[in-house]
Structures are given as structure tokens and as C-alpha cells.
Curated annotation (Swiss-Prot):
UniProt organism field: Phaeocystis pouchetii virus
Protein name (database record): DNA polymerase
Record SUPFAM superfamilies: DNA/RNA polymerases, Ribonuclease H-like
Keywords tagged on the record: DNA replication, DNA-binding, DNA-directed DNA polymerase, Nucleotidyltransferase, Transferase, Viral DNA replication
GO biological process per UniProt: DNA-templated DNA replication; viral DNA genome replication
InterPro entries in the record: DNA-dir_DNA_pol_B, DNA-dir_DNA_pol_B_exonuc, DNA-dir_DNA_pol_B_multi_dom, DNA/RNA_pol_sf, DNA_pol_palm_dom_sf, DNA_pol_type-B, RNaseH-like_sf, RNaseH_sf
Length: 1045
């Protein structure tokens, strides 16, 4: 009898990755153990994973070599390859020459241009690290500097080696993503490693339970779908404000400069603003003069005498800004710092959590004009031709240059809430306070029941370092908050710089003693991570601490990016999402209390606040949004008790409750922080309330499951989805699918001035109140994906394009031609072809000073090959996606476990979003697979189908007598009342054969049947998979028409 060998494995669900060039941990030689004249760094991938017990592992991979492809001549031999690689090594120099570890000739398809499935010749070239990888890439680019602006562009005709034009392929895809594609593992999925294929680290270097080194080849996908308990930390800070306005971490003299200019502008006789008056107003800031309109300044240097101020002012008056050579730096600094100082008029970061772009994000500001005349500061102020912004800028910079440095506003409170994913409530809460903090008798039981730990610190430094200490102690996998990437992280970092504890404060990684900073390549200064995101409301710069082993989720960014809300204030968002309907009430007038009964109490705790909405034809805030404190929660009766006797009218309205922030105003926060220990508890509880709100929001919208499913579908890590734009996920997905089809993606240079193309069509609405005639809606199921599939629109099916002007003159064409100027791949046997026509546009000015206007300048015809078997890359990807979504929805219908049902739902939504985004990315100039002709052809097909749907319905149901399923005969005269992108809205104007109108409910019954019939009729003449169908919510649509048109 033979016994099977049991192979032991370890399994982890991956969630974060730390990628860098460094010295081998396996060799353990350290920096000094290598030849300093050679590039000895390796490409290192640190993977973080969680097991079912909630323990974290650090898995180091050192043997994956970054690579890309270079398209070369189809006749190249091994000799040509060796000579070309030697040429590249020569370009790299002696230091990097050994960093190319492998190269070989391969045959692959290329993504762009139809070529009858031809295989082309490429060199696959691999490097030890990304430093050498990127250095070799520079050969294919040309650098320029125009007016001080650095620009790097792809060589238009490739890199010319001898007589061969060489082109880069697959070089813009992060090497980490290629590892996922090759090993077929998911960055948020389960992996397994054989225990005999791993090496345990000799010396502990992380805060993880386990530390391993292994080969990437030993990472295998685990057939597992267990739920893991991510540890989640939600934090929020409160800051002081010396002037009672928006907190500023590092202060200059802008407030004093603003006060002085406001005084000057209000003067009737401005000649009285002389040297004496100017000096008096500056000294008033230091308390030596009485000027009611001048705010006090708080210098770091204490007890500055009047004599010292006199000496400073004397030098200050001699200062001529135009002669100051360092003012260029000031101008640059101004662009970065204005986003903070411009918040002076905001009530508070908390009141404006995401509500205003200026408060929520560091938005780019226009450059202030510098003052170039030879004049001192007083003369600049007195110059009536000088702009106010310039005066303010020059005065602020001059005061900051000569007068003592000012104290910034301090971090006074940090709240932290910790919850394990899938648990029903947080397990620990912290309030870190600068100063004493005493719990009032009323809240002592609340503190015990919610495991609230209050930590008192005497200094701001102590507050910041305690935050780091708790982060290490609790060791969360996910760190969240509201607008933390726009305010909290940046404020804390700048305060740590100001008080000299930056390195200790930023040891927030899962790697022991790792300081979470990077060097800014422009300034050479150490900074926290910065990122730029583009949303519908504009372009924003974000700052956050990149913590290896911890995922940052800013819920303010999530809601701005993925939801359309009337407000993005935390108070509104909490009330909108964390809410439910009121079933009944018991009013206790004697004790001035009301018990509220509701099915769902998620997110509510004793001591938090709720507000109510009255819902009828519209939604109104009950008592103008008044907030009520919760005194008690009874889970057995599904009810909570509020601190007021409220007669909610459940007969007249549908009443909803919504979670609200603590009822503490901004000014109260600033004032209470400087009062008694009990007063400070009020602020601390408020701060902790915001932490709890964010935790419940994260759970309610289930952003974790949503992003995990998208991560696994597109093979991109969670932090890519949360911190980068939308393009990277589709780039990864398309690259993976191309790889499966032996196809490579080139690096493409985008033409930013190629005009654009026409989007979706909208029919002019026939406005009216449709009360008696039901309006039906028939739309196309997945219009753009279906159009790409049905017409085989793809980069690799495009045969040629011909562009004409408005006079039908051919002005340009593309496509491979032979010596006789014939298109090589046109009219091939076994292929059919589809031509798509669309208008071309340019942005033109009618006059030199007029605004640019999008103008039709001609048209373009694109020819796409229709394959005898299968589809081109993009349609094939879409077919896979639509098929996967259908299968997932089928599984969801069979699943009984609500948690798994939710996972399937998030999965099918991720597939839907990816499928619908593919067309858009084809037309996005920032896309890695930009192809305007495919996107423009897709919208052209969409417009054609929209008109087709309208024409079929209006044509086939025009004065036609139809017998319905119940035998009733009706006369139809279909009329389109509106149409948009993929939908046609129409009414049948039903009558009996005798000419009597059929209206209201009976008309609705007939309209539903006729609309379904019309959709089926139109679908018969369409290519698969295009379907024209009735919307399922036709009844709801009718009520919307009645209420809103």
C-alpha cells in the first residue's frame, strides 16, 4: 500500500504591496557588501497578506525581473539580437551594463492595426531592477525644455538602430501587474505557498506575525474564498485656531497683511497712511498699539520688546521686493501654500468636510503677479494701479522675511476608532488629548461600554507620537477617515516638521522603523506622498502618508468620485446613507423623551445624534435639521430613545431618521479646547463621533468588498484603485487579456490637438405634463459594448481610415500599403468589412480674440475587418465580461447567504463598470490604449441605433390597428417625446378603432405590451448581441414624468 505525500502549504489573502529597488534580504550583505561601482540593487516586491486567523504575513519576492518588449525587424537573427543588446548596454554605461539579465527573440501579435493575424518579431529584455529598466527606456524618448517647462516625448518614428526602426511595447505597465498576469494570482485574492518553498526571515523587520522570502514562481492561486477580518482604523483630528478661523499648521503673516490692507482700503484719505500709521498697525499685532481691526500675532520668540520691533521695522522699510533675487522661490511657494491660507473664510474643516473644493482639497491656484517697480512695501501699498493680490502677496512675504516666525495652529485632539471587518461594532476607541480630560458622570457608562481609552498628553509632540504608538499597537490593515488626504495627513505632517518630530511621527508602516517619507525630486526635500486626481468638479492635489502594509481609504474622495450627492459634508453624507424609516413612535411628554421604532439601527450608539426628514412629494428637514441626542438603544424592540418629546406626523409623512454629527459648533470646539478638563471631553467625544460615522459609512457602502472585487477582476492592487485614476485598472485588464491572446500593447504618443469627436445624441424633448398618455422607455442593453462586439470595432481590426474635408477632398489616410499604394489588408478572402463614418472636428476661432469653438471640418471613414471566426481583442474582452456578469448574476440568484450574495453583487457591478468603461478609455487621451477611431466609431454606431429605434417605433406604429393579447384592438400613432444616448421615450397616443382616446391605467396596460412588442420587433433586425428592450421600471418612470416634467 502506497501513501500519498502530504504537501503542506500556507495560505494568505493578499491586500497590499510595497515595491522598491533595494539590496537583497536573502543574501543579507547590506549596502557595504556590494561593489559600489556596479548596480547591485534588485527589484523587490513585499506582499502583505492575512490568514483566516487575522494574522498578517510579509512575503518578500526578489527574483522577478522587470521586462518589456522592443519591436524589431522581422528578419532579425540571434546575431542581431546580441548586437542590439550590446548597443543598449553601451548606452546604459558601465554602472548599469550588468543590469540586463536576459533577452530573447519572440514572436507576438501587435495590438494596433489589422494585419491578418501576423506574428511580428520582438526582443523581450529583462532587468534586475526598475532603475535600469527606466534608464534603458529613455533611449526611445526625446527631452526638451521650452520656456523652463521640461517635456519628454516618445520618438515619433521609434529608435533608429542602423536601418531598423525599433518600438517600445509593454513598457508602461507596472512590473508588479505583470507578475499577477504571469502567475495568474489576484492582488486581493488568496495565494498559497508550499512550506518547503519559503525561507523564514532570520531577524524580525516588520510588525507582522510572519515574515517569509520566496520565489515568485512558488506563488500559486488558492482555491479559497474565506472572509478575513481586516483590522480597520478610522481617525480624525481637531486643531486649535489662534484667530478663530481655519487652522493653519505653519503660519505666515497673511492674516496681519490682510488686516492692514483692509484698513487701508477703507480709508477715505489714503494719504494719512504714512510710515507712522504703517508701523502702528504692524506693532498692534504684537500688542504694543491699540487697533481694533488688527488680529494678534503669536510669534515663537516670546517677550519681543518695542525696541526690537523698531529695529526690525527700520530694516523692513529699506526692503525693495523687486531687487530680491529669492522672490522666484516665493512665487513658487505661493502656488503651494495658497490652498491653505485661502481657507481663512471657511467656518471649519469639519463643517466643510468635502463641501467646498477649497476646504476639501488642495486645489491649484493661479500665480500671483510679482511687483517689478523699484519701491518699498509702503509705496507698493499706496500704488493704486497695483492689484490687491499682488499687494497682499508682497506685504505677507516681506513681513514673513523680516519679522519673527509665528506659531502655527496645533493638533489638540486625535480620535481613533478600531473595528474588525464583519464585526457589528468597534472594539476599541481612543481619544488623545493635549491637556487634561475628565469624563462627565453622564458619559461614564458610555465610555466603559464602548471601551473608550482617554490618553492625556501635555504637549502636541506627545499627541502626535501617541498616534504613531497606537497605530503600531493596534496594527490596522486599513486606515480611513473623512478628507484625511485633503487635510488631516498634511496638517499633522507639517506640524511634526514644525515641532521637530517628523521621523518618529512617520514610523507608521508595518515595517519596523520605516519612516513613511519620500524625497521630492524637484525640491530635494522629504515629503509625504502626493497625488493628483481629476473629478467632475476639477483637478485636485492630495497629500497622504503612504504606509506599507496599510491601505488608505479617504471616504470623502470615495463619495466625490463615485456618488452624485447634493452635498459632500460628512453630516449630510452620514444622514443620507446611515438612515432608515421610522415605523412608530412613543412620546413621553412627562420626561420630554420620544422612543423611535425602526427596523435598522446600524450605526447608532448612545450619545450620538440623529435628525429627521419628512418625505412626501418632496423631502424636508424636520425642524430645520435639528439634532436629537440618543439616550438609550433597545435592540430587542428595535428602538432608540431621543432627548425630546417630538410629535412626528407618521400619517401625513414618511419619516426617516439619519445619523448626524455631534451638535457642537466650530467656535465651541476652539473655545472648549482651552477650558476645563470636562469641556475638553466634549470636543474629544465630537472627534470620536466623526471617526464612528466614517466607520459606519465604510461598512454601509461596503467599499472594501467593492474594491476587492474590482481589484481581483482587473488585477490591480487596492491602493491603485483608491489613489490612482480610473485608467490603470483597464490598462491592467486589457494587458492581461492581450497576453492571453499572444498580443502586445505598444507605448503610444497621444496627439493632444486631434480635435475630438461627436458624442452621444440627444433628441429635443417635447415638453409637457403626460398625465393621461403613459410614456414608455425602450433602451439598448449595454449599447456601446454591444456596438463594439457587433461591428468588431477594435485596434487590431482597423484596416484603414480615410479623412475628407467638407468638399469631399481626401486629405489624409492611414493603413499599411504596398508599393502600388494599395491597402495590403483590404479585401482579403475569408474576411468581410464594415465602414463607419463620423464627423471630424477642430477647435477654431471666428476671430483672433474669439473663444475657441468645436467646429465640424470634415468627416472620416474607418474600415474594420470582420473575422471569419472569433472577434478582435476589444470585442472579445467585452464578450468575456458580459458572459462573466451573466454567470455571476446566476450564482447570486442561487446563493442564500446574504454576505456572499453581496460579494456576488459587487462582483457583477465591477464587471459592468469595467465593460462600460472600456469604450471610454479608448477615447481618453490619457489611456494606455488610446484609439480615437474606435471610440468615435462606437458613438457613431450608437447614434445610428438611436435613430433606428426611433424610426422603427414611429414608422411601424403610425396609424396602425393592432390586436393585443387579450383580443382588444387598438390604433397606435407612436410619437417620440425624448431620446438620450441609448434610450427612446415615446407614447402611442392610443385610440379605439372608433377613434375614442384610451388613457390612464388602461392605456398603461396596453403601453407595456406594445412597448415590449416594439423592442422585440426592432431587435429582429439588429446584429447580436444588440438588444432593444423595455425598461423594467416603466411604472416608476410614469410617476416621475407626472411629478417632474
Amino acid at each position: 500500500m502506497t501513501t500519498k505525500t502530504v504537501i503542506k502549504t500556507k495560505s494568505y489573502k493578499l491586500y497590499d504591496f510595497n515595491v522598491y529597488d533595494g539590496f537583497s534580504k536573502a543574501e543579507n550583505l547590506g549596502k557595504n557588501g556590494y561593489d559600489k561601482f556596479k548596480d547591485n540593487k534588485k527589484f523587490i516586491i513585499q506582499m502583505f497578506g492575512i490568514n483566516t486567523a487575522g494574522q498578517t504575513a510579509s512575503i518578500i519576492v526578489e527574483d522577478f525581473n522587470p521586462f518589456y518588449y522592443i519591436k524589431v525587424g522581422d528578419d532579425w537573427t540571434e546575431s542581431d539580437r546580441c548586437e542590439f543588446v550590446s548597443h543598449i548596454k553601451g548606452k546604459l554605461g558601465v554602472y548599469y551594463e550588468d543590469s540586463i539579465v536576459a533577452s530573447k527573440l519572440v514572436k507576438r501579435h501587435k495590438l494596433y492595426g489589422f494585419d491578418d493575424n501576423k506574428l511580428h518579431t520582438f526582443i523581450k529584455i529583462s532587468f534586475t531592477n526598475t532603475g535600469a529598466y527606466n534608464r534603458a527606456k529613455k533611449m526611445f524618448y526625446i527631452d526638451s525644455n521650452v520656456d523652463g517647462v521640461f517635456k519628454r516625448e516618445l520618438l515619433p518614428d521609434g529608435y533608429l538602430y542602423e536601418e531598423t526602426k525599433c518600438y517600445l511595447y509593454e513598457a508602461n505597465i507596472p512590473p508588479l501587474l505583470k507578475l499577477f498576469h504571469i502567475q495568474e494570482i489576484s492582488p486581493s485574492g488568496w495565494v498559497q505557498i508550499q512550506t518547503d518553498k519559503i525561507t523564514k526571515m532570520r531577524q524580525k523587520s516588520t510588525h507582522c506575525a510572519y515574515e517569509y522570502i520566496t520565489s515568485y514562481k512558488h506563488l500559486k492561486k488558492a482555491d479559497k474564498d474565506d472572509i478575513v477580518k481586516y483590522s480597520i482604523c478610522s481617525f480624525d483630528i481637531e486643531a486649535s485656531s489662534s484667530h478663530g478661523d481655519f487652522p493653519v499648521p505653519i503660519k505666515d503673516y497673511k492674516k496681519l497683511a490682510t488686516n492692514i490692507l483692509e484698513y487701508y482700503n477703507e480709508m477715505e484719505d489714503k494719504t494719512k497712511f504714512d510710515v507712522t500709521c504703517f508701523k502702528k498697525h504692524i506693532n498692534a499685532g504684537y500688542g504694543y498699539e491699540r487697533c481694533p481691526d488688527i488680529a494678534t500675532v503669536y510669534p515663537k520668540l516670546k517677550n519681543i520688546s518695542n525696541e526690537q520691533l523698531d529695529n526690525i521695522f527700520s530694516n523692513f522699510m529699506l526692503y525693495i521686493p523687486a531687487k530680491d533675487q529669492s522672490r522666484k522661490d516665493y512665487i513658487k511657494e505661493n502656488e503651494e501654500s495658497d490652498s491653505e491660507s485661502d481657507n481663512d473664510d471657511e467656518e471649519d474643516k469639519k463643517e466643510n468636510d468635502g463641501a467646498d473644493e477649497a476646504a476639501a482639497f488642495h486645489k491649484r491656484h493661479k500665480k500671483v503677479k510679482k511687483y517689478n517697480k523699484t519701491a518699498n512695501i509702503l509705496q507698493i501699498i499706496q500704488d493704486d494701479k497695483c492689484e490687491h493680490d499682488t499687494k497682499l502677496f508682497e506685504l505677507n512675504k516681506a513681513l514673513t522675511k523680516f519679522y519673527p516666525e509665528l506659531e502655527g495652529d496645533m493638533v489638540t485632539f486625535i480620535g481613533m476608532t478600531f473595528l474588525n471587518y464583519s464585526d457589528k461594532k468597534p472594539h476599541t476607541r481612543y481619544i488623545i488629548v493635549k491637556g487634561g480630560c475628565e469624563v462627565p458622570e453622564k458619559y461614564k457608562s458610555w465610555v466603559l461600554e464602548n471601551n473608550v481609552k482617554i490618553i492625556e498628553k501635555t504637549t502636541e509632540k506627545g499627541v502626535l507620537l501617541e498616534f504613531t504608538k497606537i497605530m503600531t499597537l493596534e496594527n490596522p490593515h486599513i486606515v480611513t477617515g473623512y478628507n484625511i488626504n485633503g487635510f488631516d495627513f498634511d496638517f499633522m505632517f507639517k506640524r511634526s516638521k514644525e515641532i521637530g518630530c517628523t521621523e518618529d511621527f512617520l514610523k507608521l508602516s508595518k515595517n519596523i522603523d520605516e519612516v513613511c517619507m519620500t524625497k521630492d525630486w524637484k525640491t530635494g526635500e522629504m515629503e509625504i506622498a502626493k497625488n493628483k486626481i481629476v473629478l467632475a468638479s476639477g483637478e485636485y492635489n492630495l497629500s497622504f502618508v503612504n504606509m506599507p502594509g496599510r491601505i488608505i481609504v479617504d471616504m470623502c474622495v470615495v463619495f466625490r468620485r463615485e456618488y452624485t450627492l447634493s452635498s459632500n459634508k460628512l453630516d449630510y453624507v452620514s444622514s443620507y446613507f446611515i438612515s432608515d424609516s421610522v415605523k412608530k413612535i412613543d412620546v413621553d411628554k412627562e420626561n420630554n423623551q420620544t422612543r423611535i421604532y425602526s427596523k435598522n439601527l446600524t450605526g447608532l450608539t448612545v450619545g450620538c445624534y440623529v435628525k429627521f426628514d419628512e418625505v412626501s412629494h418632496s423631502t424636508n428637514n424636520y425642524k430645520k435639521g435639528q439634532k436629537f441626542e440618543i439616550l438609550d438603544i433597545n435592540l430587542d424592540t428595535a428602538s432608540f430613545l431621543i432627548d425630546s418629546a417630538e410629535e412626528l406626523d407618521l400619517k401625513k409623512y414618511k419619516i426617516n431618521w439619519g445619523l448626524a454629527k455631534d451638535d457642537v459648533s466650530v467656535q465651541e470646539i476652539f473655545e472648549l479646547a482651552n477650558k476645563s478638563d470636562i469641556d475638553r471631553f466634549t470636543v474629544g467625544k465630537y472627534c470620536l463621533g466623526d471617526c464612528d460615522n466614517v466607520i459606519w459609512l465604510l461598512i454601509k457602502v461596503d467599499i472594501i468588498t467593492d474594491k476587492v472585487e474590482m481589484s481581483n477582476l482587473c488585477d490591480v492592487p487596492l491602493n491603485f484603485l483608491l489613489q490612482r485614476g480610473q485608467g490603470i485598472k483597464l490598462q491592467s485588464y486589457v494587458s492581461k487579456k492581450c497576453g492571453e491572446k499572444n498580443t502586445l500593447m505598444p507605448i503610444v504618443e497621444k496627439n493632444l490637438n486631434d480635435g475630438g469627436y461627436e458624442g452621444a445624441h440627444v433628441f429635443n424633448p417635447k415638453t409637457g405634463l403626460y398625465l393621461e398618455d403613459p410614456v414608455a422607455c425602450v433602451d439598448y442593453s449595454s449599447l456601446y459594448p454591444s456596438s463594439m462586439i457587433s461591428e468588431n470595432l477594435s485596434h487590431d481590426s482597423k484596416v484603414w481610415t480615410k479623412e475628407y474635408d467638407l468638399s469631399n477632398n481626401l486629405i489624409h489616410s492611414t493603413g499599411e500599403k504596398d508599393a502600388d499604394e494599395n491597402f495590403i489588408y483590404d479585401n482579403l478572402p475569408n474576411y468581410t468589412y464594415v465602414d463607419v463614418k463620423y464627423d471630424t472636428y477642430e477647435y477654431l476661432r471666428k476671430t483672433p480674440k474669439a473663444a475657441e469653438k468645436k467646429t465640424v471640418v470634415g468627416y472620416k471613414i474607418c474600415r474594420f475587418a470582420q473575422f471569419p471566426k472569433g472577434k478582435a481583442i476589444m470585442p472579445a474582452i467585452l464578450e468575456d465580461l458580459l458572459s462573466a456578469r451573466k454567470a455571476t448574476k446566476k450564482l447570486m440568484g442561487k446563493e442564500e447567504d446574504p454576505f456572499k450574495q453581496n460579494i456576488y453583487d459587487k462582483r457583477q457591478l465591477s464587471i459592468k463598470v469595467t465593460a462600460n468603461s472600456l469604450y471610454g478609455q479608448c477615447g481618453a487621451r490619457t489611456s494606455a490604449f488610446y484609439e480615437k477611431d474606435v471610440a468615435a466609431s462606437c458613438t457613431a454606431i450608437g447614434r445610428k441605433l438611436l435613430f433606428y429605434g426611433k424610426d422603427v417605433i414611429e414608422g411601424c406604429y403610425n396609424n396602425v390597428e393592432i390586436t393585443l393579447s387579450d383580443g382588444v384592438k387598438v390604433v397606435t400613432k407612436a410619437e417620440c417625446v425624448y431620446g438620450d444616448t441609448d434610450s427612446v421615450f415615446f407614447k402611442f397616443n392610443l385610440k379605439t378603432p372608433e377613434g375614442k382616446r384610451i388613457i390612464n391605467k388602461q392605456a398603461l396596460i396596453y403601453t407595456i405590451e406594445l412597448a415590449k412588442q416594439a423592442g422585440e420587433l426592432a431587435t429582429k433586425f439588429l446584429k447580436k448581441p444588440t438588444r432593444f428592450r423595455v425598461r423594467e421600471n416603466i411604472l416608476a418612470f410614469q410617476s416621475i414624468i407626472q411629478e417632474k416634467i
